[in-house]
């Protein structure tokens, strides 16, 4: 039986881990990296995910998609989506009020939902785990920022379904990090732990109490839109202005130049966590102009000063909400790559009056680590280390209904431990009112117009009665994924209705998910074909070059008759020319071409080797050398190439 995995689906990087042999193992991808860029690229011939996609982004900026997490579960006219679009080289359009990403793939324009892009990243994480575990993986726990609302959680779950995963549970990133921390530290008594999670695109602060394996989230706050990329943006804008001053040219008109600058800025930012100054050197950045400059840590801190200061507000908020003063916080745990920035650490240390910060867990891997532990528990792992863990999470926003006059009446308050169920009795507003409209909102404002509408439904068929007489019981039921079901029942008649928040909510319908699953399978098939084609091409190429090398081998040179040598040289020349002029040849065409060349080469080789007294070692069947990957080129299957660039 294959194991359940934990996936940290990040804005910029993702990570996958599994619980086995009584411990968590973070799984490295095919490039040997323990985190994988959350990037998907589309080219004329194939789809790339992860490192391969990020590595070619400067050459293909318009068709390389990243930051899907900043779009997932949001509306197109969301202010944050509109502001992000200024920084993205790919096109985002509105389809039915929802953002979709438009790219060109194999010469055709295609649109994808953020869920589909995220599902491709999840698929890559799943494949990484399958390669490591040697079997099919179906079950996973996927993490989201604590501050994600209902639609963002639903959309993340949908992405999991499209990637072919059974998402056992959606858990909050800081909670997962707390498990990673708590598992390492079996301590006596109750501990108040503050998790400070500043990642590539999101920021979360949570305050938990850990006591004898019970993790209870007391409060959570943050910004679903603050992270390392925002610091990169500040650097990019700074250098764009500098380039303009020095060269009187605006490089923002060129997506490739902007991307190369962004990559250099990201590298500079990382360097400044350990060095006081760093240089940026980019040859021929824009219109042939080289860009050489430097930046100090102090200047970087000044550029991002307001963003860094913002990180303290949610810390104050969780302390207020959980009614704990800062002196009572036992541990401050850092999670997320951006917590390596010295200024962020200093602000936090100063806020806690010089307290030591806890850096014992790897900030990049902690979330996936905790998710893997939770996955093991949910799939029935009973090892000594996991059996005592109990996770009590909270609802990030209050949920309730609209009552007379547009007033928001919450049934489930923010920071209530989930899963939870709450019922309240309401009545009619007018005499002989035949039905009621139940409108479900989430948010913290007193009036519904300032909150987020989750969905609505009608309960009709109420018998005529004076206002205030009918009794309508409204029930809110939040499951362990912080996903909501609402029902309303009229007590007199027993008539009831309930809402599946799906479509009003901007959730994908089951038909759309089906369609996307089909597309995902089609992509997987296309990826497989692209791989086979590359292998066939590499096989043919290496066969031709092996023939050329063989004709130049000193011990065979003398055995070759002039006519045969000429024939082989002609075959090699024509083969190379054919490859150059048939760059888009299909797998079958490549295999047929190899067969055709083999039929021309083999008789000549047989003649040489029989004259030389048998084939030299390593040339099975008289063919010139084995193709890479160890397969003899004589076979119909073509050689297999292990490594793809």
Swiss-Prot record:
The keyword Signal does not apply. It comes from the Eukaryota. One of its GO terms (molecular function) is ATP-dependent protein folding chaperone. CDD domains: ASKHA_NBD_HSP70_HSPA1. InterPro entries: ATPase_NBD, Heat_shock_70_CS, HSP70_C_sf, HSP70_peptide-bd_sf, Hsp_70_fam. Residues 611-645 are annotated as: Disordered. SUPFAM superfamilies: Actin-like ATPase domain (SSF53067), Heat shock protein 70kD (HSP70), C-terminal subdomain (SSF100934), Heat shock protein 70kD (HSP70), peptide-binding domain (SSF100920). Pfam families: HSP70. One of its GO terms (biological process) is protein refolding. Keywords: ATP-binding, Nucleotide-binding, Stress response. PROSITE patterns: HSP70_1, HSP70_2, HSP70_3. Residues 614-637 have a biased composition (Gly residues). GO terms for cellular component: cytoplasm; cytosol; nucleus; plasma membrane. Belongs to the heat shock protein 70 family. NCBIfam families: PRK00290.1 (NF001413). PANTHER family: HEAT SHOCK PROTEIN 70KDA (PTHR19375). UMS2 is essential for vegetative growth. This is Heat shock 70 kDa protein 2. It comes from Mycosarcoma maydis. The gene is UMS2.
């Amino acid at each position: 039986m294959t194991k359940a995995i934990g996936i940290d689906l990040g804005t910029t990087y993702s990570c996958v881990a599994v619980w086995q042999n009584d411990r968590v193992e973070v799984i490295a991808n095919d490039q040997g990296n323990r985190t994988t860029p959350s990037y998907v690229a589309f080219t004329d011939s194939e789809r790339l995910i992860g490192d391969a996609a990020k590595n070619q982004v400067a050459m293909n900026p318009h068709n390389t998609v990243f930051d899907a997490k900043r779009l997932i579960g949001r509306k197109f006219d969301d202010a944050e989506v509109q502001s992000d679009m200024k920084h993205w080289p790919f096109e985002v359009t509105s389809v039915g009020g929802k953002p979709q990403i438009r790219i060109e793939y194999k010469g055709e324009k295609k649109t994808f939902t953020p869920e589909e892009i995220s599902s491709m990243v999840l698929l890559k994480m799943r494949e990484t785990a399958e390669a490591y575990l040697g079997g099919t993986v179906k079950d996973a726990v996927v993490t989201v920022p604590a501050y994600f609302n209902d639609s963002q959680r639903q959309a993340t779950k949908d992405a999991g379904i499209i990637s072919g995963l059974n998402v056992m549970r959606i858990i909050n990133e800081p909670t997962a990090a707390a498990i990673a921390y708590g598992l390492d530290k079996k301590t006596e008594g109750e501990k108040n732990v503050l998790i400070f999670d500043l990642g590539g695109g999101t920021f979360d602060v949570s305050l938990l109490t850990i006591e004898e394996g019970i993790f209870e989230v007391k409060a959570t706050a943050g910004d679903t839109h603050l992270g390392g990329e925002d610091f990169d943006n500040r650097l990019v804008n700074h250098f764009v202005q500098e380039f303009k001053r020095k060269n009187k040219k605006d490089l923002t008109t060129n997506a490739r130049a902007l991307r190369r600058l962004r990559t250099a800025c990201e590298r500079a930012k990382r360097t400044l966590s350990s060095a006081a100054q760093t240089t940026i050197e980019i040859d021929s950045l824009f219109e042939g102009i080289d860009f050489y400059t430097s930046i100090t840590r102090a200047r970087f801190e000044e550029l991002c000063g307001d963003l860094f200061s913002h990180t303290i507000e949610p810390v104050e908020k969780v302390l207020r909400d959980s009614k704990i003063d800062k002196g009572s916080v036992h541990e401050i745990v850092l999670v997320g790559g951006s917590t390596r920035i010295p200024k962020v650490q200093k602000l936090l240390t100063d806020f806690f009056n010089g307290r030591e910060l806890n850096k014992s867990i790897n900030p990049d891997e902690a979330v996936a680590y905790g998710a893997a532990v939770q996955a093991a528990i949910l799939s029935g792992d009973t090892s000594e280390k996991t059996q005592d863990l109990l996770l009590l999470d909270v609802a990030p926003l209050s949920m309730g209904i609209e009552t007379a006059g547009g007033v928001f009446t919450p049934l489930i308050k923010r920071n209530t431990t989930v899963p939870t169920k709450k019922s309240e009795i309401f009545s009619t507003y007018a005499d002989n009112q035949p039905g009621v409209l139940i409108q479900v909102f989430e948010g913290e404002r007193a009036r519904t117009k300032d909150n987020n509408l989750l969905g609505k439904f009608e309960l009709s068929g109420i018998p005529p009665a004076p206002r205030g007489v009918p009794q309508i019981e409204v029930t809110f039921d939040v499951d362990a994924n912080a996903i909501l079901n609402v029902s309303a029942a009229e007590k007199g008649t027993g008539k009831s209705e309930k809402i599946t928040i799906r479509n009003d909510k901007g959730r994908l319908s089951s038909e759309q998910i089906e369609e996307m699953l089909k597309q995902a399978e089609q992509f997987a098939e296309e990826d497989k074909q692209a791989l086979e084609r590359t292998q066939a091409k590499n096989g043919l190429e290496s066969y031709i070059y092996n023939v050329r090398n063989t004709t130049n081998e000193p011990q065979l040179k003398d055995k070759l008759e002039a006519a045969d040598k000429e024939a082989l040289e002609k075959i090699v020349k024509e083969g190379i020319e054919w490859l150059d002029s048939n760059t888009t040849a299909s797998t079958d065409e490549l295999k047929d071409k190899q067969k055709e060349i083999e039929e021309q080469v083999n008789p000549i080789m047989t003649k040489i080797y029989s004259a030389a007294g048998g084939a030299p070692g390593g040339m099975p069947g008289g063919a010139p050398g084995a193709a890479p990957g160890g397969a003899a080129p004589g076979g119909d299957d073509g050689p297999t190439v292990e490594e793809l660039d």
